Amino acid sequence: MPSGQHSAQTTKAGAGLVLGLGCERRTPAEEVIALAERALADAGVAPGDLRLVASLDARAEEPAILAAAQHFAVPAAFYDAATLEAEASRLANPSEIVFAYTGCHGVAEGAALVGAGREAVLIVQKIVSAHATAALAGPATLRAEKRIQAAEAV
């Protein structure tokens, strides 16, 4: 396992999409799951396309993050702040406030990108609820397909 990563046991192999999640401590699982489902809907993908839920290692025991992984029947991976911060140049929504609290400029986007790999892109930029954030990363080809579908729909 790469340095900086802690992973739950794998439960299924997916299509390559990674859901990055961040949340305040004790955020209700229902809120995180609803936000995660919104991210998937925004991308126009099915829950079965998801292969991983990812977050900051400080949230490795956060019930809401673990519940989201269980809800989608995918493993959860947790990365340290330095690993997420290495993705800062690829974030769509870097935050100095998040950096002050966590040591990285973006939890949801950073975790999604780390989990999806070096060639991945953000499919859904950070979206927020009252107490959580979510982002979706995956192959650049998926983002291109979504742009083509959107253009054809017009």
From Swiss-Prot:
Q: Which gene encodes it?
A: cobE
**Naturally occurring in which organism (per UniProt):** Sinorhizobium sp
GO BP annotations of the record are: cobalamin biosynthetic process; porphyrin-containing compound biosynthetic process
User: Which SUPFAM superfamilies does this entry report, sorted A to Z?
Assistant: CobE/GbiG C-terminal domain-like
Keyword Transmembrane helix attributed: no
Q: Which UniProt keywords apply?
A: Cobalamin biosynthesis, Porphyrin biosynthesis
Q: Fetch the Pfam families from UniProt.
A: CbiG_C (PF01890)
Coiled-coil features, chain-numbered ranges: none
Any idea what this protein is called? Answer: Protein CobE
Known pathway: Cofactor biosynthesis; adenosylcobalamin biosynthesis
**Native organism taxonomy:** Bacteria, Pseudomonadati, Pseudomonadota, Alphaproteobacteria, Hyphomicrobiales
